Amino acid sequence: MQRRRKRRITTTLALIFGTFLFVTLFLSFILFPIHVKSDTMEDGLSAGGIAFVCPLLKKPERGDLYYLSRMDGHRESYLMMCADSFIRFFTFQQISPFSESSKSSGQPFVRRVIALPGDSIYMKDFVLYIKPAADKHYLSEFELSSKPYNVQIFSIPAEWDNVGVSGDLEEQTLKEGEYFVLADNRVESLDSRHWGAIKSERFLGRVLLQYFPFTSIKAY
């Protein structure tokens, strides 16, 4: 009887450890959920929504939504990232003990990839115009993207002209490994207009699916 009890306890502990290991590895390398807390990506991603990110996909195309590393340069240890993913998964994104921050630059964020390495770009009235390296003419971001999306652009008072991020940018050319990312809310969000081009190593994974709220399920 005692031997059977020990065997049952050992089996249970092995099952718990195996489940923990599987979930941790899955959330670290295959698919992990993120909680979208702001409206910077509406209508693409809903504020308060939860989406899946695939860390295996790190070769962006125009129009892709990508999860980017925090802009303050801080990186959590691998163990802390695994533990954070595990806790977030089982608390439905309500608790994230190792990634919470009060600073906008102190946590990972989602932005849309608009321009690729080698592109020449300029912005007019919050819309980016792009000339790929092999082309001779500029086209709008919407004409070049294979993925349809909408952006929030609304008129602002004249006294706001010098406040926040500009809706106009002079021509520039992206270098190798540089990407230009923008928020869908072009008036009230920080993005490459403020930070400059994003290096490829900042991509943590591509956003694949918003699965919550259930009334707004979207694939990207």
Label every PLM stretch briefly.
Residues 2-4, 21-22:
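Classical N-terminal secretory signal peptides
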Residues 3-10, 43-220:
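Soluble "head" domains of membrane/secretory-pathway proteins
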Residues 24-41:
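Aromatic-capped interface at the extracytoplasmic side
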Residues 11-29:
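Hydrophobic membrane-insertion alpha-helices, especially the h-region
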